[in-house]
Amino acid sequence: MPRREKGVPMQFKNILVPFDESEHAQAALHLAIDLAGDDPDAVINIITIVSSDIMPPSMISSTGVLGETPIDYGSYETLLTSMAERADRELHDSLAGLLGKDMDTIMARLAIETRLAPSPVDGISSYAADHRCDLIIMGRRGLGALRGMLGSVSYGVLRSSDIPVLTVK
């Protein structure tokens, strides 16, 4: 894919790249960086989603008496916070390794966030809306028919998004 010509303004100024460290997500990030080029107004939002629905509601209780192995809500929140902090560290480490010396030059245009959401699709869609993103670039994966070829997350984002979604492999 040819790079955008220097000095030509980019149509998309607020790009969202959901990142899960996969090869497809890495390709999506590199494409976003190429599309942004040297446009000083372009922002690349990089997010990773931690699922907040890791336990069924019947196992979470303020009294600790529901479910087979109940966990109180405070412990559940602590667990989610710990998972999000670990995911955030891993995201930053992964980006530093992936971008290397280029990270310093583009860091001012990156917005990096780890978000808790019921599902990756919900997290990506709500982030895009909250931050008024105008393009989502994400990896695609899977096997089978259309839904399988795109992967369940990219398929869900394509179906739920009101903005353009570009999937890459």
Task: Locate each region found by the language model.
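Small/aliphatic-rich secondary-structure junction motif
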Residues: G7-Y76
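Short glycine/proline- and acidic residue-enriched helix-loop micro-motifs
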Residues: I71-M83, L110
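Glycine-rich, Arg-bearing micro-motifs that act as flexible, cationic patches
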Residues: L135-G156
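Short secondary-structure boundary segments
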Residues: T48, G139-R141, K169
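Structural beta-alpha unit
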Residues: P2-M10, S51, D93-L135
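Short, flexible loop segments at boundaries between secondary-structure elements
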Residues: S160-K169
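General small-molecule cofactor/ligand-binding pocket signal
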Residues: N45-I47, A111-R115, L166
